[in-house]
């Protein structure tokens, strides 16, 4: 199973582009499955409750919960939902989100350690958008989550740079895609076209 993880700060379009990439892969005849974190499993439901809370969230606790939810997904959830092991698993956030988000409060080294049982992705697509753009998109939503504040997202964005360096050092193919170019937001089709082309190439597949 080849893991393709899509990452970025909240408001960067990770969920949208995960769904579209999966559709392109499936349309090309690839046995692809779309997976989202937090999952719909028992631990994932607990995490979602914390994320919607107006109270503070303990970073260490969240790191452990996300790690447990991730292993549940990899060992049980994916097989059940995907009808076996897919050729390509497109993940709407993976352990790199934990390293970036919980790494801010708990330290990158410790969060990395509790996620060692989760294999590295083959490809990590990082959708890079300025924090102010992400916040504008978040503000347009009906509901915000506990992590979606300007100060915190700035720290997460900085932490992602460390996470990307770590992933590269471990042999992960990192694909950085700009969501904004020349000060102008790129359209969804434009961004997705670049993501699909570069992912297909990295996987050794015919052009999307």
From Swiss-Prot:
Its EC number is 2.7.4.9. Gene3D superfamilies: P-loop containing nucleotide triphosphate hydrolases. Pfam families: Thymidylate_kin. It comes from the Archaea. One of its GO terms (biological process) is dTTP biosynthetic process. The keyword Disulfide bond does not apply. It catalyses: dTMP + ATP = dTDP + ADP. Keywords: ATP-binding, Kinase, Nucleotide biosynthesis, Nucleotide-binding, Transferase. GO terms for molecular function: ATP binding; dTMP kinase activity. Residues 8-15 are annotated as: Defective ATP-binding. HAMAP family: Thymidylate_kinase. Belongs to the thymidylate kinase family. This is Putative thymidylate kinase. It comes from Aeropyrum pernix (strain ATCC 700893 / DSM 11879 / JCM 9820 / NBRC 100138 / K1).
């Amino acid at each position: 199973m080849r893991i393709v993880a899509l990452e970025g700060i909240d408001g960067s379009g990770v969920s949208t582009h995960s769904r579209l990439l999966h559709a392109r892969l499936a349309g090309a005849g690839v046995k692809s499955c779309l997976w989202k974190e937090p999952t719909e499993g028992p631990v994932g439901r607990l995490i979602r409750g914390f994320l919607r809370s107006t109270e503070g969230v303990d970073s260490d606790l969240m790191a452990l919960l996300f790690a447990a939810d991730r292993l549940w997904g990899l060992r049980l959830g994916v097989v059940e939902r995907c009808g076996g092991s897919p050729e390509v698993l497109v993940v709407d956030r993976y352990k790199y989100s934990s390293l970036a988000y919980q790494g801010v409060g708990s330290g990158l080294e410790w969060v990395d350690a509790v996620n060692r049982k989760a294999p590295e992705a083959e490809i990590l697509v990082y959708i890079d958008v300025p924090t102010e753009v992400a916040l504008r998109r978040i503000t347009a939503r009906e509901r915000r989550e506990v992590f979606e504040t300007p100060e915190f997202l700035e720290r997460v964005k900085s932490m992602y740079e460390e996470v990307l360096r770590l992933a590269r050092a471990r042999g992960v193919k990192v694909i950085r895609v700009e969501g904004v170019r020349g000060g102008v937001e790129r359209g969804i089709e434009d961004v997705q076209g670049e993501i699909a082309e570069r992912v297909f190439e990295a996987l050794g597949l015919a052009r999307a």
